From Swiss-Prot:
Compartment(s) of residence: Mitochondrion inner membrane
Keywords: Copper, Membrane, Mitochondrion, Mitochondrion inner membrane, Transit peptide, Transmembrane, Transmembrane helix
Family classification: Belongs to the COX11/CtaG family.
Gene3D superfamilies in alphabetical order: Ctag/Cox11
Subunit structure of this chain's protein: Interacts with CNNM4/ACDP4. Interacts with RANBP2.
Purpose: Exerts its effect at some terminal stage of cytochrome c oxidase synthesis, probably by being involved in the insertion of the copper B into subunit I.
NCBIfam families, sorted: PRK05089.1 (NF003465)
Segment annotated as transit peptide: 1-28
GO annotation, biological process: ATP biosynthetic process; intracellular monoatomic cation homeostasis
Mitochondrial matrix side: 29-90
Record protein name field: Cytochrome c oxidase assembly protein COX11, mitochondrial
A Pfam family it matches: CtaG_Cox11
Taxonomic superkingdom: Eukaryota
């Protein structure tokens, strides 16, 4: 602390005891003194005080604390390598799972629809029908059901698609006819193909379609507009199913997707291997 205090100007000796009084501290000492108090101890306070005194300097690289050397223990190195290998394996499995889930999301929709078409489960209407059965059906007049219609278009298809009627009323055992309208507002021919669904799901096994445009390629030229009929009936057994007691509303929903020319699909619900093609459009 040399140079921080002025020389003593008074010294008293009394009975072997000496006492001296220092002069006033210099300005440098006044600036550094708060940083060098015991309460300000530590690297930050000491460095700040030395900076104010002008005696601080940055430590050289040789004075820096030595970094921790890499472990030379063979066991530790093998353990670190094992951890890295495990991390790579986990990342590989995660990437494979993500790709698998993406592929399953694309494949699940058509497979699920084909399953529902064949079994009549999951809210899909049954496509199979027999002419004798239709002719011999007995309508259940006291069981009135409201049928509503919905239309959707996939983002890849630039069509205008809508039902021509919002609702109709039918009874089990009675045939009904409804229409949808589709238009191609683009300047090029577009081929579309549709799927359908029935809500509530439990009513799908009783919803029978005699004639419709589903699973068939529909080619529309630029600015062309067509009407698409749906001929269907509700099976009379609908009125005998206790699960359908509170079902008075059924919704038939169609969704159109863009299809490639020449694409064919098997007709669900039929025992034959008949396929639909553009020539069989309704």
């Amino acid at each position: 602390m040399g140079g921080l205090w002025r020389p003593a100007w008074r010294r008293v000796v009394f009975c072997g005891w000496s006492w001296s009084h220092l002069g006033r501290p210099t300005r440098a000492a006044e600036r550094a003194e708060p940083c060098l108090r015991p309460g300000r101890s530590g690297p930050a306070g000491t460095e700040q005080g030395l900076r104010r005194l002008g005696t601080w300097r940055r430590p050289s690289p040789a004075e820096q604390p030595a970094r921790r050397p890499k472990s030379t223990n063979p066991y530790t190195r093998s353990q670190e390598e094992d951890w890295r290998r495990r991390n790579k394996t986990v990342l590989t499995y995660m990437a494979a799972a993500a790709v698998g889930m993406l592929g399953a999301s694309y494949a699940a929709v058509p497979l699920y629809r084909l399953y529902c078409q064949t079994t009549g489960l999951g809210g899909s209407a049954v496509a199979g029908h027999a002419s004798d059965q239709i002719e011999n059906m007995v309508p259940v007049k006291d069981r009135i059901i409201k049928i509503t219609f919905n239309a959707d278009v996939h983002a890849s298809l630039q069509w205008n698609f809508r039902p021509q009627q919002t609702e109709i009323y039918v009874v089990p055992g009675e045939t009904a006819l409804a229409f949808y309208k589709a238009k191609n507002p683009t300047d090029k021919p577009v081929i579309g193909i549709s799927t359908y669904n029935v809500v509530p799901f439990e009513a799908g096994q009783y919803f029978n379609k005699i004639q419709c445009f589903c699973f068939e390629e529909q080619r529309l030229n630029p600015q062309e507009e067509v009407d698409m009929p749906v001929f269907f009936y509700i099976d009379p057994e609908f009125a005998e199913d206790p699960r359908m007691v509170n079902v008075d509303l059924i919704t038939l929903s169609y969704t159109f997707f863009e299809a490639k020319e020449g694409h064919t699909l098997p007709v669900p619900g039929y025992n034959s291997n008949q396929q639909l093609s553009p020539a069989s459009n309704l």
